[in-house]
Amino acid sequence: MEVRSESNITQARSDKLPLPPAVPKPRVQVWFVRVCSSILVWTCLVQLFAAGELWHSRIFTGLTNQISRFSAPVEPVPLPPPLPPPRNYTSNGILLVSCNGGLNQMRSAICDMVTVARLLNLTLVVPELDKTSFWADPSGFEDIFDVRHFIDSLRDEVRILRRLPKRFSRKYGYQMFEMPPVSWSDEKYYLKQVLPLFSKHKVVHFNRTDTRLANNGLPLSLQWLRCRVNFQGLKFTPQLEALGSKLVRILQQRGPFVALHLRYEMDMLAFSGCTHGCTEEEAEELKKMRYTYPWWREKEIVSEERRAQGLCPLTPEEVALVLKALGFEKNTQIYIAAGEIYGSEHRLSVLREAFPRIVKKEMLLESAELQQFQNHSSQMAALDFMVSVASNTFIPTYDGNMAKVVEGHRRYLGYKKTILLDRKRLVELLDLHHNKTLTWDQFAVAVKEAHERRAGAPTHRRVISDKPKEEDYFYANPQECLCEGTNCHDLFGHRNLTH
């Protein structure tokens, strides 16, 4: 039997007894710090609210706005407009087109080719742009226009492919039928002579597209489609749109501005044979250039005869006198919507002296912003197009493609002021003033009288049935698209449209 000592029993009992409670000194200290901190924080908050009430602290207001913003319901992001349903039709073939000329000539041609494709129930391939003309611009359609928008926005009219299917390409041995459509052709020509070609060839390539559709005599639905493509289907790329908008914004911040389409560029002078104001060396240089391009048909041109007929662009010196005579003041802001002026800044000196606030895109934008568009004349022309359309007043010094297309666009936007210079009359007046026959006051009065009805107001297109090249261009005045319904007499008045 095991015997335990008293001391051992006492030790065992003492191990089972609870220890007396210790004083929690660290916990008291923690609670004390917390109470003091709370008092301090509440004091600061009270002071902050008081300061906000007294001085409307922007910091506190911003904080409140942030809280409200996060607590308020989130506004849904607006969805893009729904796409029109695709038109369901049996395609008669594929139309491939190669546009020729500068940006605005190609723009009009694209509108015409979409319309032809719709008329003939064809599938259109996104048009190829001119890369071999004087400007040698390598830009493709996708470098200038928003391809996705072009295809989607017109899909209820025409089926458009990004590229020609491989089986129809020359690379795979397909012999494509090429042709230039007859200029100024009507609906009957395309239905009777062009449509049968697709039954035989499936793919037809139009290798020239300038002015291949008549100005007049087409069904109203086709004229409307030409306008729809021009005003809605053809959007510039987001990059071009952004830079063009920035240019317009800079100009508008400086006040109203005139967009002057000063078509005094080397290619135009060489093509037209207009050398008034040029030195003998410059005239010879322009003549040599004219002979360099075989597709420029006229070679021997008498400059002064051409000028007297009103067929030459005004010189910068002549423009200075005309603008002053029209009443534009010296502080008028003028944007030069053009490429390189022939003779450079030297030829602009008189115009700049008369109107010191002359600017160009190169003066308004950083060189880095323009760098990606340099050596791409069509992309630079797109910037000038956007500025010209947005200007308070547009004045072209020559009636080329840009002048005409911008004029029509400004009519579509509500007949914005566009001064269409009567160059034939102006040449007469300028010469009379130059030889002292007319005083300045007489000259100014005569210039204003000559342009009272040439500011872009509503009017009918002039129709010359047997001379379509001499009649008013559809895209300069798309009158069918500028009034509601099919009857435009209320807008234009009752007039005979032909002569």
From Swiss-Prot:
The chain crosses the membrane at residues 31-50. It catalyses: alpha-D-galacturonosyl-[(1->2)-alpha-L-rhamnosyl-(1->4)-alpha-D-galacturonosyl](n) + UDP-beta-L-rhamnose = [(1->2)-alpha-L-rhamnosyl-(1->4)-alpha-D-galacturonosyl](n+1) + UDP + H(+). Substrate binds at residues 261-263. It is found in: Golgi apparatus membrane. It holds the Pfam family O-FucT. GO terms for cellular component: Golgi membrane. It is an enzyme of class 2 (transferase). One of its GO terms (biological process) is pectin biosynthetic process. Pathway: Glycan metabolism; pectin biosynthesis. It is a single-pass type II membrane protein. Belongs to the glycosyltransferase GT106 family. Glycosyltransferase involved in the formation of rhamnogalacturonan I (RG-I) oligosaccharides in the seed coat mucilage, which is a specialized cell wall with abundant RG-I. Transfers the rhamnose residue from UDP-beta-L-rhamnose to RG-I oligosaccharides. This is Rhamnogalacturonan I rhamnosyltransferase 1.
